[in-house]
């Protein structure tokens, strides 16, 4: 199969171990239809093609510890970067700002002066945290524009791909809508343990910040119970991390 320019740009950063999965998906009718819809768009695709599969550029499938699901990318071209909740913008999006506040509440040692680098979440991505949007693209300035375009089937097949290799990371759903979207639209979550937590958006009120149950510590406790190395949740690499704080 001759790959078109759009697909080549999409997979330009993908690690070979993930390419094995994606190269099988691109042969399927649903993915060919998805590519045609993306190519037919007159408006800008968010994120840009080179970043759509960026989530698959940091570690091998076998090293996937946790999947934190978002719904779809930030619709602003200055924010979307291919990682759910992360941003390339120097201004921290509201949801990410609350994620950082929650993190500092659970780990006071991580409290630091604001830095534009905190928005990237690269330290998480480099430790086996798959920051995965249920829908990987949208149209500039329009939320949820590519629902039912095929990304749901892609992510359903992704979970099958992991499960078939006996890779069963913890699935983390932030918000009821995200959980319902993943369970109903993507499906195939049987066999995976999962954790549900309020959404960090200000539209959800203060539930994310005031929830008495820990989020990040719960994830690390799960990893310890499964004999895996815990995540250093520092949002900026090399920041001090005291797991007991």
Curated annotation (Swiss-Prot):
The active site is at 72 (proton acceptor). InterPro entries: UDG_fam1, Ura-DNA_Glyclase_AS, Uracil-DNA_glycosylase-like, Uracil-DNA_glycosylase-like_sf. It is an enzyme of class 3 (hydrolase). It is found in: Cytoplasm. SMART domains: UDG, UreE_C. Its EC number is 3.2.2.27. Keywords: Cytoplasm, DNA damage, DNA repair, Hydrolase. The keyword DNA repair applies. The keyword Hydrolase applies. One of its GO terms (cellular component) is cytoplasm. GO terms for biological process: base-excision repair, AP site formation via deaminated base removal. It catalyses: Hydrolyzes single-stranded DNA or mismatched double-stranded DNA and polynucleotides, releasing free uracil. GO terms for molecular function: uracil DNA N-glycosylase activity. Belongs to the uracil-DNA glycosylase (UDG) superfamily. UNG family. Excises uracil residues from the DNA which can arise as a result of misincorporation of dUMP residues by DNA polymerase or due to deamination of cytosine. This is Uracil-DNA glycosylase. It comes from Mycoplasma genitalium (strain ATCC 33530 / DSM 19775 / NCTC 10195 / G37) (Mycoplasmoides genitalium).
């Amino acid at each position: 199969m001759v790959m078109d320019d759009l697909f080549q740009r999409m997979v330009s950063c993908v690690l070979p171990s993930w390419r094995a999965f994606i190269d099988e998906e691109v042969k399927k009718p649903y993915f060919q239809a998805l590519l045609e819809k993306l190519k037919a768009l007159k408006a800008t695709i968010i994120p840009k093609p080179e970043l759509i599969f960026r989530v698959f550029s940091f570690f091998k499938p076998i090293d996937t510890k946790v999947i934190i699901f978002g719904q779809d990318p930030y619709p602003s071209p200055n924010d979307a970067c291919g990682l759910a909740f992360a941003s390339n913008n120097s201004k921290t999006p509201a949801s990410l700002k609350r994620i950082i506040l929650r993190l500092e509440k659970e780990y006071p040692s991580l409290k630091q002066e604001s830095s534009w680098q905190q928005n990237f979440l690269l330290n998480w991505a480099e430790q086996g945290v798959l920051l995965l949007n249920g829908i990987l693209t949208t149209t500039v300035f329009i939320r949820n524009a590519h629902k039912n375009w095929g990304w749901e089937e892609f992510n359903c097949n992704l979970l099958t791909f992991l499960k078939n290799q006996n890779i069963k990371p913890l699935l983390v759903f932030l918000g009821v809508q995200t959980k319902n979207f993943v369970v109903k639209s993507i499906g195939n979550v049987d066999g995976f343990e999962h954790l549900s937590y309020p959404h960090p958006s200000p539209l959800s009120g203060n539930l994310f910040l005031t929830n008495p149950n820990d989020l990040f510590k719960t994830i690390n406790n799960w990893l310890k119970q499964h004999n895996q190395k815990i995540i250093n949740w520092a949002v900026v690499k090399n920041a001090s991390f005291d797991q007991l704080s």
